[in-house]
Amino acid sequence: MNAPAQWHIAVDFGTSNSAAAHTAPMTGAVETLPLSHRSNLIPSAVFVQADGAIHCGDSAISLGRRDPSRLVPAPKRYIGHDQVQVAGQDVPLNALIGAVLYGVLERGRAQHSGENPTTVTLTHPESWSVHNVDMLLSAAATVGLSKDTIRTISEPRAAAIHYAAQQHIPAGSHVAVFDFGGGTLDIAVLRAEQNGDFSVVAAKGDNTLGGRTIDNVLYRWVLDQVEHNDPDTADELKSAEVSVMHSLDQSIREAKEMLSDTSSATITVSTPRGEHDFLITRDEFNTLTDKVVGRAVELTQAALSQAGVDKSTPIYMTGGSSRIPY
């Protein structure tokens, strides 16, 4: 009997979404792992049932519309705690994170005839303490991964190594990683070492700045438009049911993503009173998000200054929010 084919996976457990790459079954080439029918991302959200069963990703979001008290949208934000209170119950944080890892690994196994990966690489923020990294390892253990198969690496180092595989970075030179995700912004300046690895020489970040910040700015803009055009609908929207707000959140995210490629987009507000469509142009979007972008630029300049490098240092942009044109 032939031994099972070896395969490897790397998982980026994010604040809002998680992603993964694996070695393809047929070629062994490193490829992005599809995590749903429509995306290479999976929401990092989890839903805890009354019986303790934990769902992750899109199913967690769906269940959370019916009972928001049992939804944890961003388990990563609880790093540093051992327990998270969900609907009056204390739930181990490693179980919540483990549920997300399990969801990702199941999709990987489905691509590899149900076999477990030979190695698993887990990324984490540069600023995490040993205790925080141990929590990630503990979460991996809850889904049956043995410690000797797991490697951890900081997110900026992983990004720099990926960038260096595409662009030559001479030893001793620097590269900046601008990681603008759904929930956080992290900037690091790294120096290329002789052995091909990278060391972080400066880092800045904001754990409250991300794609959701921009979503909130757009929500306030929509509310202003509704109040101007239909005050009664605005009052209704402020106390709307979860399903109404979810629909609006989705429309806002879709419009934000469309503005990366088009000069305008429509945000739809659907309530029992009817539908309202609001057109937003890219110029309006840029004006609305000017403070967010300004803060991101400020942090980037601070990181470059701290590292003692100039503006000619290459910047590798990663994270979904980095795709937004500014």
Question: Locations of the language-model features?
Answer:
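Generic structural signal for well-ordered alpha-helical scaffold segments
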Residues: 101-110, 161-165, 294-305
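Alpha-helix capping and helix-loop boundary segments enriched in small/acidic/polar residues
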Residues: 127, 175-176, 205-213, 239, ...
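Short acidic loop-to-helix transition motifs that present clustered carboxylates
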Residues: 153-161, 322
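Helical "lid/coupling" subdomains associated with nucleotide-phosphate turnover
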Residues: 224, 259-326
